[in-house]
Every structure is written in C-alpha cells, then in structure tokens.
C-alpha cells in the first residue's frame, strides 16, 4: 500500500506521529508496523451508552417529524418522557405544535427564569406533566429518576450529546 512506499522513503531515524479519530485494530497494527516503541495517547475516553437502554431509530423527513412524534407518543406508555431539541427556538415551536394537537408538555431551556425552570422540573417530577421538552444545555443540569423515554426530536450535533441525552434514562439498570 501507499503507506509502505512512504515509509521506505523516510529516514530511518525520525519521529513518526499517527492521529486518528477512531482506533480500530487495523490502525493499531499500522502503528506497530511503522513506529518503534509506539506510545498511545487518548485525548478522551470513548463515550458509550448503557446496555440497559433499548435504542431505536426512526427515519423521516422534516415534513413528517411532528406526525411521527405524535405517533410515537400515542403508541408508548408515556411515564416521564424527555424530548430533546437542538435549539431553544425549536423547543418553543414543538411545545406550540404539541399543544395544538392536545398533547400536554412543558418547556425546559436556559432562557427560562430559574423559578420557571424549577417549576417545570417539579411539575415533571411530580407526574403532573409527563413530557419535558429540553435543550442539551438545560438537560445537563437535570437529575430525574424514572425517565422512561428519551426522544431526540433533532439529531444531536455531537456524539457526546447523544450519549448524554439517552443517559437520562436507564440509570437504574
């Protein structure tokens, strides 16, 4: 392969650095072949999800997202469900759309006054409202037991946000 050719044309005494977003066996073997006394440095541990959580993906276009969400909500036993949106303005839009469809929910995001956020959390924790629509930033600050479902209305921008979002459920194992 190309890497063999490149390596043959390099000086024998050199510093060689490999960088990879993912480290699978193939990448590690390449490192062992071309680097003397390799050192592995990981910037952060890989994020992973709990095996106690059942995860599903439902593909739909933007035009059908709301209908799909309504269908999901009508077909699951909604105990405590958190719906995540990527932007605060989308939380308000989704709240309004669900209200028009007679689906009760509450909003939870950083622009709400602290008293309103606490009120929303209390309403959710007490079971007075079973659907909480949240942003990632606000969602990081919540600690609620017995969340039955997490719905990503918007695909998270980074994988860490996905892991954090679904980590809201499945804590008890």
What are these model-predicted stretches?
Residues 1-173:
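Conserved helicase RecA-like core
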């Amino acid at each position: 392969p190309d890497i063999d050719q490149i390596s043959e044309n390099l000086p024998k005494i050199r510093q060689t650095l490999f960088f990879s977003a993912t480290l699978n066996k193939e990448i590690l073997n390449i490192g062992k072949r071309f680097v003397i006394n390799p050192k592995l440095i990981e910037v952060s541990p890989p994020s992973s999800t709990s095996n106690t959580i059942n995860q599903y993906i439902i593909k739909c276009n933007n035009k059908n997202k709301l209908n799909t969400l309504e269908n999901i909500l009508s077909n699951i036993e909604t105990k405590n469900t958190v719906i995540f949106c990527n932007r605060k303005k989308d939380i308000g839009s989704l709240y309004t759309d669900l209200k028009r469809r007679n689906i009760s929910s509450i909003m939870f995001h950083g622009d709400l006054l602290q008293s309103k956020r606490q009120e929303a959390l209390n309403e959710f924790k007490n079971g007075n409202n079973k659907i909480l629509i949240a942003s990632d930033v606000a969602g990081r600050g919540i600690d609620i037991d017995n969340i039955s479902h997490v719905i990503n209305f918007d695909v998270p921008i980074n994988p860490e946000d996905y892991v954090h979002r679904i980590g809201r459920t499945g804590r008890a194992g």
